[in-house]
Amino acid sequence: SMATRKASGVVLNRIAEKLPNLFGGSADLAPSNNTLLKKSEYFSKTNRSGNNVHFGIREFAMTAICNGIALHGGLHPYCATFMVFSDYMKPAIRMSALMGLPVIYVLTDDSIGVGEDGCTHEPIEQLAMLRSIPGTYTFRPADGKETAAAYEAALTLGKPSAIALSRQGLPCYENTGKAA
């Protein structure tokens, strides 16, 4: 078994090998979200060649920045945080949907099975909220194969895409993947 957030980290790094303009990061949770591109450095004032961004604890700004990057063009932006914090991102996600921007939102720890963080980190209504935003694709993969398929769809569709990922290990099912 493997948590889909771990599968997501593997998939993101494989995508980065083939798509050098994949650019993004996490609010302050890159190790937990598994969003660090291992063969790239952090983008900074002194290093403009990095593809990893440390946005800091400001989910709305992170999401709005990714919208701006998508509007500028040339890069494939993604950003990540715990799913419960998607509430802070909602106005910017809604704007990306209105503009049809190809931003990928990686939202981990997607259930009440999040462990020691307690009830403040247990998303209940967030998945329904994301699914209700017109023009936004929302994926909740059941395993690693569906996680890879969700990223492929997000990159192919060219619209805002939220990918909800588990913290807990999930079995790999025989009949999942692209067709699911």
Annotated model-derived regions:
Residues 170-180:
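Aromatic-enriched
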